[in-house]
Swiss-Prot record:
Pfam families: Ribosomal_L13
CDD domains documented for this protein: Ribosomal_L13
Gene Ontology cellular-component terms listed: cytosolic large ribosomal subunit
Role of this protein: This protein is one of the early assembly proteins of the 50S ribosomal subunit, although it is not seen to bind rRNA by itself. It is important during the early stages of 50S assembly.
Name of the protein in its database record: Large ribosomal subunit protein uL13
PROSITE patterns: RIBOSOMAL_L13 (PS00783)
PANTHER family tied to this protein: LARGE RIBOSOMAL SUBUNIT PROTEIN UL13M, RIBOSOMAL PROTEIN L13
Subunit structure, as described in the record: Part of the 50S ribosomal subunit.
NCBIfam families: rplM_bact
Keywords: Ribonucleoprotein, Ribosomal protein
InterPro entries in alphabetical order: Ribosomal_uL13, Ribosomal_uL13_bac-type, Ribosomal_uL13_CS, Ribosomal_uL13_sf
Species annotation: Bacillus licheniformis (strain ATCC 14580 / DSM 13 / JCM 2505 / CCUG 7422 / NBRC 12200 / NCIMB 9375 / NCTC 10341 / NRRL NRS-1264 / Gibson 46)
Length: 145
């Protein structure tokens, strides 16, 4: 009887990838990055094991949104105090917190639970084209499409 080889923590090789967000659409970039973080691009993908690679996103402030989403899309958060519901438009988020905007989009596409939280820790988002991970020798990743 033959068995399918299953990945486990000891036999996973992780790469560091750099993705440039300049001029890319938020949703299209987020889906592909979420897939890389999960490890679905690898033939060794195993649903119950974190097989994904580390992803560094640069130029987060240059992300694009289609249509009127910059003015119409609203991000909500709550301060946990009575009457503490706060809101920001996508334009305010992109101007002041572009890293958070990308992180929220990608986090929503990852599994909910401890495995998803572990995958999310491999995401690094930065404003501008500089990042502090040169020591890991990251490879440039070109998005499909």
């Amino acid at each position: 009887m033959r068995t399918t080889p299953m990945a486990n923590a000891s036999n996973i090789e992780r790469k560091w990838l750099v993705v440039d967000a300049a001029g890319k659409t938020l949703g299209r970039l987020s889906t592909e990055v979420a897939s890389i973080l999960r490890g679905k691009h690898k033939p060794t993908y195993t649903p119950h094991v974190d097989t994904g690679d580390h992803v560094i996103i640069i130029n987060a402030e240059k992300i694009e949104l289609t249509g009127k989403k910059l003015t119409d899309k609203i991000y909500y958060r709550h301060t946990q105090h009575p009457g503490g519901l706060k809101s920001r438009t996508a334009l305010e988020m992109r101007t002041n917190y572009p890293e958070k905007m990308l992180e929220l989009a990608i986090k929503g596409m990852l599994p909910k639970g401890s495995l998803g939280r572990q995958m999310f820790k491999k995401l690094n988002v930065y404003r501008g084209s500089e990042h502090p991970h040169q020591a890991q020798k990251p490879e440039v990743y070109e998005l499909r499409g």
